[in-house]
From Swiss-Prot:
Residues 49-61, 152-167 have a biased composition (Pro residues). InterPro entries: bHLH_dom, HLH_DNA-bd_sf, Myc_transcription_factors, Tscrpt_reg_Myc, Tscrpt_reg_Myc_N. The keyword DNA-binding applies. It comes from Serinus canaria (Island canary). SMART domains: HLH (SM00353). Efficient DNA binding requires dimerization with another bHLH protein. Binds DNA as a heterodimer with MAX. The lineage of its organism: Eukaryota, Metazoa, Chordata, Craniata, Vertebrata. This is N-myc proto-oncogene protein. Keywords: DNA-binding, Nucleus, Phosphoprotein, Proto-oncogene. Residues 396-417 are annotated as: Leucine-zipper. The keyword GTP-binding does not apply. Residues 222-242 have a biased composition (Acidic residues). One of its GO terms (cellular component) is nucleus.
Amino acid sequence: MPGMVSKNPDLEFDSLQPCFYPDEDDFYLCGPDSAPPGEDIWKKFELLPTPPLSPSRPAPGAPSGRGPGAVGRSGSVGLPHDPVDWASELLLLPPEADLWGGMDGGDFFETGPGVTNNLNSIIIQDCMWSGFSAREKLERAVTEKLQNKTPAAPPPPPGTAGSPPVPARSGRAVPECVDPAVVFPFPVNKREAPAAEGLRRRRRARGDSRASSSSSSSGDDTLSDSEDDEDEEEEDEEEEIDVVTVEKRRSSTNKSVTTLTITVRPNNTTFSSVRTQQNGLILKRCAPIHQQHNYAAPSPFVETEESPPQKKLKVEVSRPVKPTIQPKLKSSSPRNSDSEDSERRRNHNILERQRANDLRSSFLTLRDHVLSELVQNEKAAKVVILKKATEYVHSLQAEEQKLLLEKEKLQARQEQLLKKIDYKRTC
């Protein structure tokens, strides 16, 4: 931020001036090259004052000291006399103090002598918190600055009427800060920082004890103790777990596998053989788990190795049988098929010739014996012969009908004659 202001001082310095103290470069006691740029930025965020137009909160000691019209730009709002005092009030307080004014602690903005404040209330556990290293460096710088400035600051004279007392001076910084309940209404866990510190100390102690136990114990003892340390290894897997074992454990989360994961640093050469043996054990024990999760694949390795030879034997047994039977069938079937085809062709040709001869002879008979008109016409077409034959058939049918009628008449006449003969005999 100072670099940005120095690049464009005419345009941006006036708008950004309320966000910085006038002597912040002297306050931090460090140049741009003394610390990494990230930590310098986080320090500025830690000590960033409240924006000018934020809602005011009067101190309990001076309720009518400042009116609402007094809160304006940074020129109208009075800054504390010493920014080092303001930073020390924020940083050099016990971490057990409650931000929201709990039962055992005071308020964050009550800067009385017997009131405790929470260190986490600076940014309310913001995600951009720089960490413990930056906090320790900042506390060290603040303490050194306080030791240097405390003898130089003259005490205010008691007789002057314009100089306010000490609690009033500390209370003047209250309207410049925002009530966290207005901006961030969610409750903050009171024991977050001590719990986090205790958890990290516990993890470090566990890592030290685990390293010492792994150096003293052998591979078999560590295999028996691996089930008890599985939960602890999951907590420290970012620092102490091998890559191969992480992948195997993720794949085998459903089934408990007694595997050992020892973190061996490259300087230690005594546990290299133990680590290789453990890696071999892990690979051997986790391999069937992949097969069990894959339901389509055959379950064990031994059965899969034995089953393909059986299939090959079956195929090899069936293959020799087919070539022995098929050549005989092929050798016999072509000859039989050829002979049968030749016989069928011969029979078919003979039958076709006989049919053609019969048809020709029938046409010739029709032409010569039935159709007297076409006897001398040897080149008459079959169609003409068939037409003439049909006409002849129809004529024959007509004659048949006539003859039948005559027959009926004759039979009726015969009956009449027979009746007459019988009548005459009787008479």
